A protein has these predicted regions:
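Short gly/ser/thr-rich secondary-structure transition/capping motifs
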Residues: 20-30, 93-96, 159-162, 181-188, ...
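Phosphate-binding loop of NTP-binding sites
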Residues: 91-240, 244-255, 307-310, 369-370
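Short, ordered loop/turn segments at secondary-structure junctions
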Residues: 72-74, 142-143, 185, 206, ...
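Receiver (REC) domain switch/active-site residues of two-component response regulators
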Residues: 66, 199, 401
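Acidic, Mg2+-coordinating active-site environments of NTP-dependent enzymes
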Residues: 11, 70, 74-80, 174, ...
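N-terminal leader/targeting and accessory segments in enzymes
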Residues: 1-95, 243, 266-274, 298, ...
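ATP-dependent carboxylate-amine ligase
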Residues: 1-18, 39-42, 55, 253-256, ...
Length: 487
């Protein structure tokens, strides 16, 4: 729906999907959440993984819904209200959203980034680089949605399908010409990006996560691969050092394919990488020439992220020289290998690492940043993949000198049981302190000034989820308070 234009009618939204007697009914907004319904809105009642929208049709009407599209079978009596039943409504939600928001992805270039780790960093570094190249780039993802510097809060890595198209429409109104979107496996499996005309798809890596949802790595990889089957794609950027990425690349049309990695078969091949405390240098071979890339980022794992962004810029039509220049101007992403370096204090690293592979990578990088001991403070999220908990505990035992197990976002699980799952994979030398602030304070108090403390799992987050309530909490703010720093 264009701002200032006439409202869209229900008939326009459902044309070719279902017939009903309400074609001329004006629709002023749309939502999948009955709590967000406003006067004149259309409510889509869809059965989800945890909640069935059909249970909330009455609440939607009480809040002012003008009509309801409901997945069959409808669970409420229609009486005189406008309830339109549609078989497999979720399959049409993307089309309906596109019609309401006037096909926003037709008017803006969309880059989708998927993978277990690196999505946020790649999207934000890519957006920064594109801005340096004269674009107005926005992001949709974990840290927030919108143009950089003015992000709106986002509760999901990839929003629901209606919100995705709404965000794209907002990006257009903010004069963005490129959107860098994190695309989670959940989003792909649940059709949350249906109808989005992606121009470029990027694959970073695949390692264990979300098996509470996907059950096995085969299903997890299959969900990720859906992004690369979208017909609007002009380029596919794939890390072929990753086993699944290598397999995925073989399914892509050669004219669309841009590969990167240390592999000799990579179109952008890494030859050399040098990592310093706040700086990365990569020598790579592109089109027969050796190119030197520099970026002001910490951590060896960011070599792959920078290479992904460089390759994406090439795939989007920028020269290697322009891509190199743009990456020089990028800055670290909040909560991703974020360093807090205070004279006379232990070096603190805040990172979002919440998978075994990510924790392994970050701890290995932390070891190279200090001559002292490495401490790690972390927990695991509740209501999430339980299988990774002992694995993360094992990683911490192997790679850190001291480990303090604490709360992450316990949600509806008992924190002490989550901690026990983590400790099951450990060597018995760990400490457990479930109060996250106290755990951080304990590490800061006991670490030497030459030591390093990794606070992992929450990164940029500013609240802590206890299921029935959330409380304000920021790892960065806690460290600043304990170090008596000005925010």
């Amino acid at each position: 729906m264009n701002i200032g234009s006439a409202p869209v009618t229900l008939g326009q939204l459902t044309k070719g999907i279902v017939t009903h007697g309400f074609d001329d009914l004006p629709v002023f907004g749309m939502t999948l959440d009955s709590r967000k319904v406003r006067d004149g809105d259309l409510f889509l009642a869809i059965s989800g993984q945890a909640v069935d929208g059909r249970d909330f049709i009455n609440q939607a009407y009480e809040r002012g819904a003008v009509a309801v599209l409901a997945e069959t079978p409808v669970k409420t009596e229609n009486d005189s209200r406008t309830v339109v039943a549609i078989d497999e409504l979720s399959k049409y939600a993307g089309l309906i959203a596109n019609r309401f928001y006037n096909y926003p992805s037709k008017h803006i270039r969309v880059v989708g980034v998927t993978g277990t780790n690196g999505k946020t960093t790649c999207c934000h570094i890519l957006a920064q680089a594109l801005n340096e190249l004269g674009s107005c780039a926005s992001v949709i993802g974990t840290i927030g949605n919108g143009v950089l510097g003015a992000l709106r809060d986002n509760s999901l890595t990839t929003p629901d399908v209606l919100s995705v198209h709404q965000e794209l429409s907002k990006n257009l109104s903010e004069e963005a010409d490129v959107v860098c979107m994190e695309v989670s496996s959940h989003a792909l499996d649940q059709n949350r990006v249906d109808g989005v005309l992606f121009d470029v798809a990027v694959f970073t890596n695949l390692s264990q996560d979300h098996l509470d949802y996907h059950h096995d790595m085969t299903s997890y990889g299959k969900a990720k691969s859906k992004l690369f089957q979208i017909k609007s794609l002009s380029s596919c950027v794939i890390n072929i050092d990753d086993v699944f990425g290598c397999q995925l690349s073989q399914l892509i049309e050669p004219e669309l394919l841009w590969t990167y990695g240390v592999s000799e078969q990579a179109r952008v091949r890494q030859l050399l990488a040098k990592v310093e405390r706040n700086h990365i240098r990569i020598d790579c071979r592109v089109n027969g020439a050796v190119v030197e890339i520099k970026a002001p980022l910490a951590g060896a794992f960011n070599v792959s992220n920078v290479l992904a962004v460089f390759t994406t810029l090439m795939a989007m039509g920028y020269s290697s020289n322009k891509a190199v220049e743009s990456l020089l101007a990028t800055r670290p992403v909040p909560g991703r290998m974020e360093l807090i370096d205070v004279l006379g204090k232990p070096l603190v690293v805040i990172d979002f690492a919440h998978t075994p592979d990510a924790l392994d990578n970050v701890l290995k990088n932390c070891r190279g940043l200090t001559q002292g001991k490495v401490w790690v403070v972390f927990g695991c999220g509740g209501d999430r993949d339980k299988g990774k908990r002992p694995q993360m505990g094992a990683v911490a035992s192997q790679l850190a000198d001291h480990a303090i197990i604490t709360n992450d976002n316990p949600r509806h699980e008992k924190p002490e049981l989550i901690a026990a799952d983590i400790c099951a994979g450990m060597n018995g030398r760990q400490q457990v302190c479930l109060d996250r602030k106290q755990a951080i304070a304990q590490a800061l108090k006991n670490a030497g000034k030459d030591d390093l403390i990794l606070i992992a799992g929450k990164g940029h987050e500013t609240d802590q989820d206890f299921g029935s309530y959330k409380q304000s909490f920021s790892d960065r703010a806690v460290v600043a308070e304990l170090f008596e720093l000005r925010q």
